[in-house]
């Protein structure tokens, strides 16, 4: 748990927890604006650019991130995907993505895409990668 949340945690047993009530409702549904969606997989990267919900661009690019030790390979691949999609939009209002792993506050805490990256490079270059991308 410490690796995921960056703190030690102690979880009480489920029996001692307050009853959980699940609500059913719609999330999102906001299609307005110029948006990019991406998915980072183990064998390809996918991206789509939409304007007001209408797809203007969609692409799938082969890549092999799993055992790549250099975090720049991952960063450059992700940026390439986003830039390709952005070329089809007059502006970018929002970006949403998906990738297997654990992410907290847009930081990578653990993800199989980066399994080849050593601990030092992971902490220095991977953990805050999506925050760096958001700034650019």
Where are these regions (language model features)?
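Residue-level detector of high-confidence beta-strand sites
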Residues: 58-60
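Short amphipathic alpha-helices and their capping/turn segments at secondary-structure boundaries
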Residues: 34-37, 75-92
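Non-catalytic propeptide/linker segments at domain boundaries
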Residues: 1-33
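Gly/Thr-rich phosphate-binding beta-strand-loop-beta motif of the actin/hexokinase/Hsp70
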Residues: 21-56
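Short, flexible, glycine/charge-rich loop motifs used to bind or transfer phosphoryl groups or to couple energy/partner
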Residues: 26, 85, 132-133
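Short beta-strand segments
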Residues: 39, 96-98
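Active-site-proximal loop/short-helix segments
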Residues: 52-54, 99-104
